[in-house]
Amino acid sequence: MVTVTLISKPQARVGGNFRVIKIPEECYRCKLYGICMGRLRPGRAYRITEVRPLKYPSPYKCLLNGDEMVPVVVEEENLILPIKLPYIIEGSITSFDKSWCICHPCPSEEALPSRVKIIKVIDRRQCGSGWFFLVEAKPLD
């Protein structure tokens, strides 16, 4: 999913990646929250695909670091997830059950999607008496 958000000017470069670990308390009080951190999900990773130009210096400064904020287009990165199903078809859409994270580490619980699109099957592994697939998946929520 493509999203326009704000990032500090020193970090705004095409191809740059960042992960939102947690939204700081200061962000909730900021008047830019709705177009900045409010558009991102904790635990998810993003890649900057475009830096939008500003004709004038931005009057908006980040409450955390004091940097000038600039608009960027970001795309959510795919997740590596375990899927415990009898078979997997790349391109298919399936629900995701967080109980599948027992045998393979998953992103933080708040970052886990309820539905995913399978992009690529990476591996098939055994867990206890069963098997699961390790996949690259695009979150759909």
From Swiss-Prot:
Transmembrane segments: none annotated. It comes from the Archaea. Pfam families: UPF0179. Signal peptide: none annotated. InterPro entries: UPF0179. Belongs to the UPF0179 family. This is UPF0179 protein Cmaq_1008. It comes from Caldivirga maquilingensis (strain ATCC 700844 / DSM 13496 / JCM 10307 / IC-167).
